[in-house]
């Protein structure tokens, strides 16, 4: 999450210009293509960092559609500050062979994996 320097530069500019129409949604799943995010980038207190950049922050369950909708409604009430919604998620949630496994961050599923994922998610 947030390994690119230009993101942090944009965050600084967003609060400086009071971009209250900006919604940043961070998918915090803790994984990247090579493994756990924290093994490569020890970002620490993400909520505190975004607040320090001048954002109004809300942390939600990124798998809960109602929570997502409520957070977006809440964002519309924030004035003179950009908004950051940190969505805690599990990569591959609900698909046993992929859930929480970094190697499924990118790449292509086999036809068998694809069929199994659809079957599990449709149940």
Go through each PLM region and give its residues:
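Glycine-rich ThDP/TPP pyrophosphate-binding loop and its adjacent helix/strand module
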Residues: 1-123
């Amino acid at each position: 999450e947030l390994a690119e320097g230009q993101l942090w530069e944009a965050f600084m500019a967003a609060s400086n210009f009071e971009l209250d129409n900006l919604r940043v949604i961070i998918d915090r799943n803790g994984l990247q293509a090579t493994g756990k995010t924290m093994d490569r980038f020890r970002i620490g207190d993400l909520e505190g960092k975004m607040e320090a950049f001048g954002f109004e922050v809300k942390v939600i369950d990124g798998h809960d559609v109602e929570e997502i909708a409520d957070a977006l409604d809440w964002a519309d009430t924030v004035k003179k500050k950009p908004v950051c919604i940190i969505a805690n998620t599990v990569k591959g949630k609900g698909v046993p062979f992929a859930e929480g496994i970094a190697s499924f961050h990118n790449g292509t599923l086999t036809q068998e994996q694809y069929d199994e994922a659809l079957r599990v998610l449709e149940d």
